[in-house]
């Protein structure tokens, strides 16, 4: 069975991260709630101010804390669709009001998002590169958005290491969130981090779940940051395979260009995910994503895994 459904790094984490995780033995002691060493290493990696860096149980955990602080019943949350499904779940759980904005050409956010912003808009959620479509957003539009509203703009950069996204936004109404789950290969440990505006740091730390990361997880993340070359090597291999897989898929289906570690395409047949599963390949059926039709998302795996997917797809399509 080949799993190409969850956008994981098929090469796994740095061996140094695995060793750091395994070697920690003080499991009877609670973590240090400051996570200072990890935050400083994140600062070295990103260039961000360590005093404004927070960590959480994945990007999801960070977003949950922000919603706990900021969203009151009836507050509006602007969500370009299709995008990461948890945004919808969290908005509903927080009694916020979803304002859905359909993406434009090539699934990019366009000028229509400005019409969705009102005095009640509290948060604008932007996944960049976007899950499940894989596209990156226009830097100029993001900058205009930041300057046009007082609402908090949450930039989810879970897949940024796989992209050509290079612009940096540092403003009083911007949160940038990233993860160790994708490029760093630590998905099972659920380690997210974010850069907050200064005014939000104290409220966030007061509202966050106590000890959101275990010490072994934090130590693994620190070791991963000490071996960034491992991650970059994995990303290089994944990007090369992404290009190869894209070219092969183009011969079979209409597939979207991607700046992430997955590809997104409209299925020419019904129940494609089920048919691929019968042939030993697990992909993500995106029909449940708000704003998605009969689409499939496939993770870029190792070359042999991608070949198995392509062979199974050809068999289903009768090619």
Swiss-Prot record:
Keyword ATP-binding: no
Domain of life the protein comes from: Archaea
GO biological process, one term: L-histidine biosynthetic process
EC category: transferase
InterPro entries: Aminotransferase_I/II_large, HisP_aminotrans, HistidinolP_aminotransfase, PyrdxlP-dep_Trfase, PyrdxlP-dep_Trfase_major, PyrdxlP-dep_Trfase_small
UniProt-listed Enzyme Commission number(s): 2.6.1.9
Keyword field: Amino-acid biosynthesis, Aminotransferase, Histidine biosynthesis, Pyridoxal phosphate, Transferase
Record's keyword annotation contains GTP-binding: no
Pathway info: Amino-acid biosynthesis; L-histidine biosynthesis; L-histidine from 5-phospho-alpha-D-ribose 1-diphosphate: step 7/9
Protein name: Histidinol-phosphate aminotransferase 1
MF annotations from Gene Ontology: histidinol-phosphate transaminase activity; pyridoxal phosphate binding
Family as reported in the entry's similarity comment: Belongs to the class-II pyridoxal-phosphate-dependent aminotransferase family. Histidinol-phosphate aminotransferase subfamily.
């Amino acid at each position: 069975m080949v799993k190409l459904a969850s956008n994981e790094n098929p090469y796994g984490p740095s061996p140094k991260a695995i060793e750091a995780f395994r070697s920690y033995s003080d499991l009877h002691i609670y973590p240090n709630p400051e996570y200072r060493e990890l935050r400083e290493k994140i600062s070295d990696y990103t260039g961000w101010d360590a005093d404004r860096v927070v960590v959480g149980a994945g990007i999801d955990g960070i977003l949950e804390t922000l919603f706990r602080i900021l969203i009151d019943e009836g507050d509006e949350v602007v969500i370009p669709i299709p995008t990461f499904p948890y945004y919808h779940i969290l908005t509903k759980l927080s009694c916020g009001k979803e304002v859905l904005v359909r993406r434009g050409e090539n699934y990019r956010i366009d000028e229509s998002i400005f019409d969705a912003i009102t005095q009640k808009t509290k948060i604008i959620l932007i996944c960049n590169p976007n899950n499940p479509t894989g596209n990156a957003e226009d830097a100029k539009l993001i900058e205009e958005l930041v300057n046009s509203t007082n609402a908090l703009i949450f930039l989810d950069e879970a897949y940024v290491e796989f992209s050509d996204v290079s612009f940096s936004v540092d403003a009083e109404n911007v949160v940038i969130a990233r993860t160790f789950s994708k490029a760093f290969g630590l998905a099972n440990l659920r380690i997210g981090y974010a850069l907050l505006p200064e005014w939000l740091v104290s409220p966030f730390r007061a509202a966050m779940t106590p000890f959101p990361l275990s010490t072994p997880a934090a130590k693994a993340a620190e070791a991963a940051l000490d071996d960034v070359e491992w991650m970059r090597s994995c990303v290089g291999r994944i990007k090369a395979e992404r290009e190869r897989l894209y070219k092969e898929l183009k011969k079979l289906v209409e597939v979207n260009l991607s700046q992430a570690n997955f590809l997104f395409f409209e299925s020419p047949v019904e129940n494609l995910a089920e048919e691929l599963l019968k042939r030993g390949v697990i992909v993500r059926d995106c029909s449940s994503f708000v704003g998605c039709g009969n689409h499939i998302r496939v993770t870029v795996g190792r070359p042999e895994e991608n070949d198995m997917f392509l062979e199974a797809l050809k068999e289903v399509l009768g090619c």
